[in-house]
Amino acid sequence: MSNVVPTPVSPLFAQPFATRLERALQHLRIGRPVILMDDFDRENEADLIVAADKLTVPVMAQLIRDGSGIVCLCLPGETLDRLELPPMVDSNRSRYSTAFTVSIEAREGVTTGVSAVDRVTTIRAAIAPGARSGDVVSPGHVFPLRAQPGGVLTRRGHTEGSVDLAALAGLRPAGVLCELMNADGTMMRGASLERYAAKEGLVALAIDELAAHLQARGATGAPAELAVAA
């Protein structure tokens, strides 16, 4: 179960899931971020996610300012294959098999690559229709993640959740995320997460809720199905 139990006891989950999901999809369509939480016995993390299609420089600055600074671009395998981005390591021994590729930078239009403007430029280059390997270089300051086929029905990760939500919103199946952190460097959870969500006016969803929603509708996680499963 998620760190903040999805009952009316927590203001994050005071509204029914269907209501929060519709609000979240509306926010993603206009470029606003959404909080996505995983299970308590997994990473126990709250990530700030945004649809890559709608990413803006101010939102990127928010991800960097309020998160860990490690901004990830979550993409389906076919997009990463077209960009010819290999895995970061040959043998992935991380606890949850998080599928990092080599980091990237836009080939053109960036300076150091680390500013909010430069990271947005890199992400736009990577998700552009027809983007190819020559449009990005490695290493860089954006960290692509390979979403597993089947989305959260296959792997209960933020990577898959962000791609699934973008597809549910009718957008390109590509998400951008960063783990939320407190000012003291600890992960943002519990009461501090509730305060942050209230201050920023953000919707929160849990991955287990999203998976249950998709299972109930018989979705397989394919982007075309997700676009009509909301």
From Swiss-Prot:
Organism for this UniProt entry: Bordetella parapertussis (strain 12822 / ATCC BAA-587 / NCTC 13253)
Record: residues binding D-ribulose 5-phosphate: R42, E43, D47, R155, R156, G157, H158, T159, E179
Pathway(s) the chain acts in: Cofactor biosynthesis; riboflavin biosynthesis; 2-hydroxy-3-oxobutyl phosphate from D-ribulose 5-phosphate: step 1/1
Site (Essential for catalytic activity): H141, E179
Gene name linked to the record: ribB
Disulfide bonds: none
Example GO biological process: riboflavin biosynthetic process
Chain residues that bind Mg(2+) 2: E43, H158
Cofactor note: Binds 2 divalent metal cations per subunit. Magnesium or manganese.
Keywords: Lyase, Magnesium, Manganese, Metal-binding, Riboflavin biosynthesis
Similarity annotation: Belongs to the DHBP synthase family.
A GO CC term assigned to this protein in UniProt: cytosol
Annotated EC: 4.1.99.12
GO MF entries: 3,4-dihydroxy-2-butanone-4-phosphate synthase activity; magnesium ion binding; manganese ion binding
Reactions mediated catalytically: D-ribulose 5-phosphate = (2S)-2-hydroxy-3-oxobutyl phosphate + formate + H(+)
Name of the protein described by the UniProt record: 3,4-dihydroxy-2-butanone 4-phosphate synthase
Role of this protein: Catalyzes the conversion of D-ribulose 5-phosphate to formate and 3,4-dihydroxy-2-butanone 4-phosphate.
Cofactor(s) required for function per UniProt: Mg(2+); Mn(2+)
Residues that coordinate or bind Mg(2+) 1: E43
Gene3D superfamilies documented for this protein: DHBP synthase
InterPro entries (alphabetical): DHBP_synth_RibB-like_a/b_dom (IPR017945), DHBP_synthase_RibB (IPR000422)
Oligomer and partners: Homodimer.
